[in-house]
Regions:
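N-terminal subdomain of nucleotide-sugar transferases
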Residues: 1-46, 50-51
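Structural motif
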Residues: 8, 40-42, 64, 85-89
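Amphipathic coiled-coil/heptad-repeat helices and related helical stalk/stem segments
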Residues: 21-22, 69, 89-90
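Glycine-rich loops and low-complexity Gly/Arg-rich segments
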Residues: 27-31, 61-64, 88
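Short, well-ordered alpha-helix to beta-strand connector turns
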Residues: 33, 57-58, 79-80
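Short catalytic-loop micro-motif centered on adjacent basic/acidic residues
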Residues: 38, 60, 81-85
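Conserved nucleotide-sugar phosphate-binding/catalytic loop shared by glycosyltransferases and other
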Residues: 49-71
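Short N-terminal targeting/anchoring amphipathic segment
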Residues: 73-90
Length: 90
């Protein structure tokens, strides 16, 4: 399956318990053969503390603003099987 995640951050676990949960879940989905794209808004407090800037188990799309990424999101949603929107997603 193709699964899109919209979440707070997967690239930085700094002050962010969401990242550890996302990492475990998405790693397990990847190991089962699913294709994952994670959309994360670029936030300075996470950008300066990224401990996983290129996750090996998903495609990470860091974006500056919703307007800058919404055309890409619409395109990816067309053939996605699942879209997951996490809490605190801007």
């Amino acid at each position: 399956m193709k699964i899109l995640f919209f979440g707070l951050s997967i690239s930085s676990a700094w002050g962010n318990g969401h990242a550890t949960t996302y990492r475990a879940l998405i790693r397990a989905l990847h190991e089962r053969g699913h294709r994952i794209i994670f959309f994360e808004r670029n936030a300075e407090w996470y950008a300066s503390n990224r401990d996983l800037p290129e996750p090996p188990f998903c495609t990470l799309e860091v974006f500056e603003s919703w307007d800058a990424i919404k055309a890409r999101v619409r395109k990816e949603l067309q053939d996605a099987d699942v879209a997951v929107v996490g809490s605190y997603f801007p």
